[in-house]
Amino acid sequence: MTDRYAVFGNPISHSKSPFIHGQFAAPTQESLTYEAILAPVDGFEASLTAFFNAGGKGANVTVPFKEQAFALCDSISPEAKLAGAVNTLSLLADGTIRGDNTDGLGLVADLIANLGSLQDKRVLLIGAGGAARGCILPLLNAGIAQLIISNRTHTKAQLLVDIFTSVDNGAFANRVTAVEMNELAGEFDIIINSTSASLVGELPPLPTHIITTQTVCYDMMYGASVTAFNQWALSQGAAKVIDGLGMLVGQAAKSFTLWRGIEPDTQVVLTLLRDKLMAEPK
């Protein structure tokens, strides 16, 4: 019997997930399908229920349904709990739904693939939305020394800090802080842009001195050409820039492993996906 998986979103036609999971499944000889499902903005729960009732085993969730998916779960992972959102749903044998958030795990996996260990790194995280929130715990668990969160609206960055400094009796209290963009100081090993500004060719209002010839800049956005943020980072002398395509493949791999118990080869699929992206009409 063929196991069914899907990604839910609105819009969803642009999703790379069916291609990625198809490539993950191909070498395993396992029988499964993965489709993109356009759920009505006001009909996600009904669409998901219908999918599971029809034999669906698991699902990915993207914009704008991650928070709704979180509310539907019977159990959630620590990453999902702190993110307040899920991107991966698993229908368990007892009929309950487990929610995971693999976005931050995908980010960390891609950073490690590119840079090696993140131990003792000083990291700047730009943005304080859902994308930022989902990657904080995985970054901290990867052993970074300090995480600075900076956002146009400072109160949102401070809210994230308050959430994470209360975790595990304050275990992260000395490692996470919020700083106004115009007050950023010192050098950073890694700067991560979690905002979607690059999609419209815009940049966060950052001081140029935060980038040195040792700084690696990571934009969660991606495209056929270098993103606006990464272009700016290179112009300021960054040592290396990375876009979010590897994070996309990485989070998908974590989902695939949760469902199938198999760790797929992400680098092969990332190369195929990059080639596919470059070949798409501009």
UniProtKB/Swiss-Prot annotation:
GO terms for cellular component: cytosol. The lineage of its organism: Bacteria, Pseudomonadati, Pseudomonadota, Gammaproteobacteria, Alteromonadales. It comes from Shewanella baltica (strain OS155 / ATCC BAA-1091). Its EC number is 1.1.1.25. InterPro entries: Aminoacid_DH-like_N_sf, NAD(P)-bd_dom_sf, SDH_C, Shikimate_DH, Shikimate_DH-bd_N, Shikimate_DH_fam, Shikm_DH/Glu-tRNA_Rdtase. PANTHER family: BIFUNCTIONAL 3-DEHYDROQUINATE DEHYDRATASE_SHIKIMATE DEHYDROGENASE, CHLOROPLASTIC (PTHR21089:SF1), SHIKIMATE DEHYDROGENASE (PTHR21089). This is Shikimate dehydrogenase (NADP(+)). Gene3D superfamilies: Leucine Dehydrogenase, chain A, domain 1, NAD(P)-binding Rossmann-like Domain. Homodimer. NADP(+) binds at G127, A128, G129, G130, A131, N151, R152, T153, H154, T155, K156, M220, G244. Involved in the biosynthesis of the chorismate, which leads to the biosynthesis of aromatic amino acids. Catalyzes the reversible NADPH linked reduction of 3-dehydroshikimate (DHSA) to yield shikimate (SA). The keyword Oxidoreductase applies. Belongs to the shikimate dehydrogenase family.
